C-alpha cells in the first residue's frame, strides 16, 4: 500500500483528533467501561472525506492513542473495532460516487451516511464484543449491552453532528464550483 505524504498527514491529524477527543474527560459515561465519545464525529468526517483506508487507520491509530493516554491499557479488540467503523463509514464516497465533492448532499445521501454509521458500529464493535468474549472471557451479556449502547449512541451522535458538518461542507463545495473567472 503506497500512501502519499498528504494521506499520511491526514491520517496523523485525524488519529490525533480522534485519539485525544476519545479520552474519558471528553466523553459521556453510559455503562461499565462504556463512554459515548463525541470524537466519533471526527472519525466519521475523516472517513467520509478520505475513504475507507484513511477511515480504518484513523480509527485504529486514534483508538490506540485513546487507550494509551487513558491509562487502562490498549484493548486491541476495541482498537480493531474503531478501525472497522472508520472503514465502513469510509465507503460513503464510493457508494455516493463522491457527490459531496460536487456540492450535493441530499436526503438519500444522509440516509446512506446513517446506515453506514449504524452498520459500521454494529459490525465494528460487534467484532470487538465477540473477540472480548473469546480472548478475554468477558461476560457475553456485558459486552452485548456495551455493543447495543455504543451502536445506538454512536449512530445517533454521528447522524446529528455529521448532518450539520456534511450539509455545510456540501454547500461550501457547491459555492466553490460555481465560481468562474471574469473575462
From Swiss-Prot:
Coiled coil regions, renumbered to chain: none
Keyword vocabulary terms for this entry: Cell membrane, Membrane, Transmembrane, Transmembrane helix
Cell membrane as UniProt keyword: yes
Membrane-spanning intervals of the chain: 8-28, 41-61, 75-95, 110-130, 147-167
tRNA-binding is among the record's keywords: no
Record membrane topology: Multi-pass membrane protein
Domain of life (superkingdom): Bacteria
Listed Gene3D superfamilies: 1.10.1760.20
Localization: Cell membrane
Gene Ontology CC entries for this record: plasma membrane
InterPro entries, per database record: ECF_substrate-spec-like, UPF0397
Pfam families linked to this entry: ECF-ribofla_trS
Family: Belongs to the UPF0397 family.
NCBIfam families: PRK13661.1 (NF010182)
Protein name: UPF0397 protein VF_1566
Organism field: Aliivibrio fischeri (strain ATCC 700601 / ES114) (Vibrio fischeri)
Source species taxonomy: Bacteria, Pseudomonadati, Pseudomonadota, Gammaproteobacteria, Vibrionales
Amino acid at each position: 500500500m503506497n500512501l502519499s505524504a498528504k494521506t499520511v498527514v491526514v491520517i496523523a491529524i485525524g488519529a490525533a483528533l480522534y485519539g485525544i477527543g476519545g479520552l474519558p474527560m471528553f466523553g459521556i459515561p453510559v455503562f461499565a467501561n462504556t463512554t459515548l465519545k463525541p470524537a466519533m464525529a471526527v472519525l466519521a468526517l475523516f472517513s467520509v472525506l478520505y475513504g475507507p483506508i484513511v477511515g480504518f487507520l484513523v480509527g485504529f491509530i486514534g483508538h490506540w492513542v485513546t487507550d494509551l493516554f487513558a491509562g487502562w491499557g490498549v484493548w486491541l479488540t476495541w482498537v480493531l473495532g474503531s478501525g472497522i467503523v472508520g472503514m465502513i463509514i469510509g465507503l460513503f464516497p464510493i457508494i455516493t460516487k463522491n457527490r459531496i465533492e460536487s456540492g450535493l448532499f441530499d436526503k438519500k445521501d444522509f440516509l446512506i451516511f446513517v446506515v453506514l454509521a449504524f452498520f459500521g458500529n454494529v459490525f465494528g464493535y460487534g467484532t470487538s464484543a465477540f473477540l472480548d468474549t473469546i480472548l478475554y472471557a468477558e461476560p457475553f451479556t456485558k459486552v452485548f449491552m456495551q455493543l447495543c449502547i455504543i451502536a445506538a449512541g454512536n449512530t445517533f451522535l454521528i447522524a446529528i453532528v455529521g448532518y450539520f458538518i456534511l450539509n455545510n461542507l456540501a454547500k461550501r463545495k457547491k459555492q466553490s464550483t460555481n465560481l468562474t473567472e471574469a473575462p
